[in-house]
């Protein structure tokens, strides 16, 4: 059986699992892991096929969620960023008893634009898939640059993301392609209406991948959930606004 790379740190009485986004790995959390581990028992995970979790091919969202869950604590707050938000959401849907609270960061239940639903144009995602087979390192770098555009610290945030990618071997092309396929096809808008646990959605006001127009739409669709917008952040608020990000999570811990 292929193993998921998993690191646990901290002594908190609440477990917090952090799931990264497409093309990246758990090193992306190093800007906040020390501070968070003083409040939580923190679990850093490389999603299957990414970072140090080698030996996986392209997986469906359900397969990815099951692979991660095998090594997870019995109960935890699950936090997923971007693609990781879909994985955390899938776990909340299929194993709600394992999820103390669900937190999605710069994530959408449906990343792809649909009728009357803002998102990434499907042909843009298809274009990324096509470019992966031509020059996949450059394609990943382009995707990362999109994530920080517009912030006051865009250049240094983009450098931090690129450093995270280059710190470890690149994922296989079919793994990257499978992740884009999830972003292109998955739609959890209706299933997530019924999750029973506390549900916090975090957004960057300047995010170019998850338009802020989805926030009031999901507030209405999921009235049991809460939303919070980082006013000057783009797609990676934990990198651009680590202190504010930590405060939001510590406040959540006190409520659950």
Curated annotation (Swiss-Prot):
It holds the Pfam family Abhydrolase_1. SUPFAM superfamilies: alpha/beta-Hydrolases. GO terms for cellular component: cytoplasm. Transmembrane segments: none annotated. It comes from the Bacteria. Substrate binds at residues 22, 82-83, 143-147, 235. Its main location: cytoplasm. Keywords: Biotin biosynthesis, Cytoplasm, Hydrolase, Serine esterase. It is an enzyme of class 3 (hydrolase). It is found in: Cytoplasm. It catalyses: 6-carboxyhexanoyl-[ACP] methyl ester + H2O = 6-carboxyhexanoyl-[ACP] + methanol + H(+). Disulfide bonds: none annotated. Residues 15-242 form the AB hydrolase-1 domain. Its EC number is 3.1.1.85. The active site is at residues 82, 207, 235. GO terms for biological process: biotin biosynthetic process. HAMAP family: Carboxylester. Monomer. This is Pimeloyl-[acyl-carrier protein] methyl ester esterase. It comes from Escherichia coli O157:H7. The gene is bioH.
């Amino acid at each position: 059986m292929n193993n998921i790379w998993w690191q646990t740190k901290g002594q908190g009485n609440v477990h917090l699992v952090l799931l990264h986004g497409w093309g990246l790995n758990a090193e992306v959390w190093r800007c906040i892991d020390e501070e968070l581990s003083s409040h939580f028992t923190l679990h850093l995970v490389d999603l299957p096929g990414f970072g140090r979790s080698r030996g996986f091919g392209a997986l469906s969202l359900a397969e990815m969620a099951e692979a991660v869950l095998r090594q997870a604590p019995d109960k935890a707050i699950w936090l997923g960023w971007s693609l990781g938000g879909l994985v955390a959401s899938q776990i909340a849907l299929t194993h709600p008893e394992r999820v103390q609270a669900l937190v999605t960061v710069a994530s959408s239940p449906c990343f792809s634009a649909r009728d009357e639903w803002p998102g990434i144009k499907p042909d843009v995602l298809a274009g990324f898939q096509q470019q992966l087979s031509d020059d996949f390192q450059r394609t990943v770098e382009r995707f990362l640059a999109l994530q920080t555009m517009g912030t006051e610290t865009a250049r240094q945030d983009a450098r931090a993301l690129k450093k995270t990618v280059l710190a470890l071997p690149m994922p296989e092309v079919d793994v990257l392609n499978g992740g884009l396929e999830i972003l292109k096809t998955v739609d959890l808008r209706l299933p997530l209406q019924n999750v029973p646990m506390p549900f916090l959605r975090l957004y960057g006001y300047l995010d170019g991948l998850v338009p802020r127009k989805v926030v009031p739409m999901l507030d209405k669709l999921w009235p049991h959930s809460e939303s919070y917008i980082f006013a000057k952040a783009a797609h990676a608020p934990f990198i651009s606004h680590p202190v504010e990000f930590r405060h939001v999570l510590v406040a959540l811990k006190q409520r659950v």
